[in-house]
Amino acid sequence: VFSMQWLDGDSDRLARMESVIRETAEEIADTHEMALKYGPLLGLEPVAMDTYLREALEQSAQEHAPKQWRVMPSGALHDATNVSALMPAAMLFVPSIGGISHDFAEDTKEDDLMMGLKVLAGAVDRLI
């Protein structure tokens, strides 16, 4: 069993990526005489996060961590996607050690967690 997740904020690009992934998987399966079966796809559309909340996070990041942050339009299917149907939502990411994410080995340096909290607090201050 092998699973993949690919993310983007553009649904057309997601469809093109899926096509390339399927074609590549089929080529590999044919080369190695392997059976290939696809499970159910979520089929959820990416949702843009709230502009006002994102701007507050960006301004706070610039204040607390100048030149150490970037905008990351993930289009990810996080809880924020479901929440955004009911209320404004945005996401704040902090770096994982070694870039390992969504894995039991995922970890984050305490300094990065503290900086993330400062950025979040600064954004909240701007919003209230």
Regions picked out by a protein language model, each given a short descriptive name:
Residues 12-13, 18-24, 67, 94-128:
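His/Asp/Glu-rich mid-to-C-terminal helical/loop segments that flank catalytic regions of hydrolases
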Residues 1, 13, 17-24, 49-57, ...:
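General structural feature for long, well-ordered alpha-helical segments within catalytic domains
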Residues 1-19, 26-29, 36-43:
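Midchain, well-structured core segments that form catalytic/ion-binding scaffolds
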Residues 35-95:
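Active-site-adjacent substrate-binding region
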